[in-house]
Amino acid sequence: MDSFKGGMNLERLPESLRPQPSHDMASSFHLQRSSEPRDPIENSASESSDTDVPEKERSESRKTREDGGAGSAGCTGAADDPAKKKKQRRQRTHFTSQQLQELEATFQRNRYPDMSMREEIAVWTNLTEPRVRVWFKNRRAKWRKRERNQQMDLCKNGYVPQFSGLMQPYDDMYAGYPYNNWATKSLTPAPLSTKSFTFFNSMSPLSSQSMFSAPSSISSMNMPSGMGHSAVPGMANSGLNNINNISGSSLNSAMSSPACPYGPPGSPYSVYRDTCNSSLASLALKSKQHSSFGYSSLQSPGSSLNACQYN
């Protein structure tokens, strides 16, 4: 009884006398025991899943960031590729002497060849048409630069001395009208009182003769017919004598006057002599015409008179 009161000790009983548990109890016990250790496993799995989720999210976010960075880098690289290609300089074309001679000869003939001509040149020189076009473009730029430099050199060497030469007369502008001694300062200018003006010396004898011969011709034309034909030759001879005297005096004054500063000293006198001789000949012809006109005008009334009128 004590044993029953104190509890049944199953360990002291032999295995044959031990009560065998039923199948239901075993299954329930097994399920209970199997369910008990699964709780911590599930808890541990849940805990591990709770801890792994942020890590996975972090890893995924890192992967997405890395992928995005790689994509952006790829985009920037793709965007930089054309720039790199543009920055890369093309290799220079090395022309041979024969090609350069052919191109230079064509450039001397035509500085702006068209498309067909460039293609022909490319065939001749064994080059491509773009290379020929670029060569002509560079050659035209070089030619324009050379032309500008030459013009600048001409301006510097040509116009500066002329400007300095034009600035010289301001030193002695009112020192006696020294018009012809800009380059030669050693020549002393003549004073104003002794300097003869070239206006009267430059007058041709033809104009002076015409000035002085006009009154004689007018007087001979306006003479009355009653003075007779003897007055007409006298006036013509006096007019010729006056013309000779005037022409001689004008030539002597021209010879004695200083040379004209704006022309060679010996060239005008031969022209004056020729004009003088020609003017004298023309005046002689005019005087003969006037004399013949006077004779006819004087003789015409006498021929109309009858013999009875003289009585």
Curated annotation (Swiss-Prot):
Residue ranges, compositional bias (Basic and acidic residues): 53-68
GO terms of biological process kind: anatomical structure morphogenesis; regulation of transcription by RNA polymerase II
Keyword terms of this UniProt record: Activator, Developmental protein, DNA-binding, Homeobox, Nucleus, Transcription, Transcription regulation
Disulfide bonds: none
Main location: nucleus
Spans through the membrane: none
One MF term in the entry's GO annotations: DNA-binding transcription factor activity, RNA polymerase II-specific
Motif (OAR): 278-291
Region feature (Interaction with PIT-1): 148-277
DNA-binding region: 88-147
Single GO cellular component term: nucleus
Residues covered by region (Disordered): 1-102
Subcellular location(s) of the protein: Nucleus
Annotated function: Sequence-specific transcription factor that binds gene promoters and activates their transcription. May play a role in the development of anterior structures, and in particular, the brain and facies and in specifying the identity or structure of hindlimb. Acts as a transcriptional activator by binding to promoter sequences with a TAAT/GCC core motif.
Membership in a protein family: Belongs to the paired homeobox family. Bicoid subfamily.
Protein name in UniProt: Pituitary homeobox 1
Organism of this sequence: Gallus gallus (Chicken)
